[in-house]
Curated annotation (Swiss-Prot):
Gene this chain is encoded by: rpoA
Keyword line: DNA-directed RNA polymerase, Nucleotidyltransferase, Transcription, Transferase
Keyword rRNA processing assigned: no
Protein name according to UniProt: DNA-directed RNA polymerase subunit alpha
Disulfide bridge map: none
Organism of this sequence: Paramagnetospirillum magneticum (strain ATCC 700264 / AMB-1)
Length: 338
């Protein structure tokens, strides 16, 4: 059946997020297990989208009282205009709604001028209020008007100059992406006795306008939308599969035989000697009962617990009406392809 192309591939059960020192800005996002090679495929694709395609807000132009171009200096300001612009380019912003919007800065020396002094409307948030923009000497004054817009990726200053721009408007390079850094690594992970599945760990740092896990979710949604075009068939119906699931009042894995679990020889022999045939027989045993089995030790116990956990099962389960009267017939149906 066509759906086997994707249904029989192993997939992560859920995404694990390890928050950094500042959970709003840094985190490690972990996905496992993945088919071999998928870690690199997904990691590289997500990284490129994260760095290039997420929407964000940035300053696209400024006007400074008494300044005509970016190569000027301002009396009483220790930094020249070029240095001030470099600092403004690193300013993290969150904007609610569409732009362009305006922000204003009015400062009097002496002292450092930080982003927290910028006057903003209700629809703009400054993510780095402690960012130092410049330093003023005694008696120095500084007035700046900022133009803020939304966009994606990197847009050079040459594209941020409107045709009817007034004299003194200085366009600047805009870094719209809320994602600052992305790194990923792929390691081996184990499922049962198979040890060559992929584990993808992505370290994501943002400017605070979006959380790292939300950024990854947005990147995945972008990829999903772009790839949808390449699917040239309709999703096959799963009516037969659903009917079969409805026939069973319990997890269908309970009908599998324990010799399908690819256990070590010692563990498999212990189960066979104890007349444990189906997984349904196995999960009803407690840990204490298993350890009383001849030649069955703690190592074998841990191996079985790990394999059962991959199927959402565990030892010590209570299963009503087990075994079913037609267990062999049900087990045979389970082996048949849909």
């Amino acid at each position: 059946m066509i759906q086997k192309n994707w249904q029989e591939l192993i997939k992560p059960n859920k995404l694990h997020v390890e928050p950094g020192a500042d959970p709003q800005r840094t985190a490690i996002v972990v996905a496992e297990p993945l088919e071999r090679g998928f870690g690199m495929t997904l990691g590289n694709s997500l990284r490129r989208v994260l760095l290039s395609s997420l929407q964000g807000a940035a300053v696209t132009a400024i006007q400074i009282d008494g300044v005509l171009h970016e190569f000027s200096s301002i009396p009483g300001v220790r930094e020249d205009v070029t240095d001030i612009i470099l600092n403004i380019k690193t300013l993290g912003l969150r904007m609610h709604g569409e732009g362009p919007k305006r922000m204003h800065l009015r400062a009097v020396g002496p002292g450092e001028v930080t982003a927290g002094l910028i006057e903003v409307g209700h629809d703009i948030e400054i993510m780095d209020p402690e960012l130092v923009l410049c330093t003023l000497d005694e008696g120095a004054k500084l007035n700046i008007e900022f133009t803020v817009e939304t966009g994606k990726g990197y847009v050079p200053a040459s594209q941020n100059r409107p045709e009817d721009s007034p004299i003194g408007l200085i366009p600047i390079d805009a870094i719209f992406s809320p994602v600052r850094k992305v790194a990923y690594k792929v390691e081996n992970t184990r499922v049962g006795q198979v040890t060559d599945y992929d584990k993808l760990s992505m370290t994501v740092e943002t400017n605070g306008a979006v959380t790292p896990d939300d950024a990854v979710a947005l990147a995945a949604r972008i990829l999903q939308d772009q790839l949808q075009l390449f699917i040239n068939f309709e999703e096959p119906t799963a009516v037969v599969e659903e009917e079969k699931k409805d026939e069973l009042p319990f997890n269908k894995n309970l009908l599998r035989k324990v010799d399908e679990l690819e256990l070590s020889v010692r563990s498999a022999n212990c189960l066979k000697n104890d007349n444990i045939i189906y997984i349904g027989d196995l999960v009803q045993k407690t840990e204490a009962e298993m350890l009383r089995t001849p030649n069955f030790g703690r190592k074998s116990l841990n191996e079985i617990k790990e394999v059962l956990a991959q199927m959402g099962l565990h030892l010590g389960m209570e299963i009503a009406n087990w075994p079913p009267e037609n267990i062999e017939e049900l087990a045979k149906k389970l082996e048949e392809p849909y």
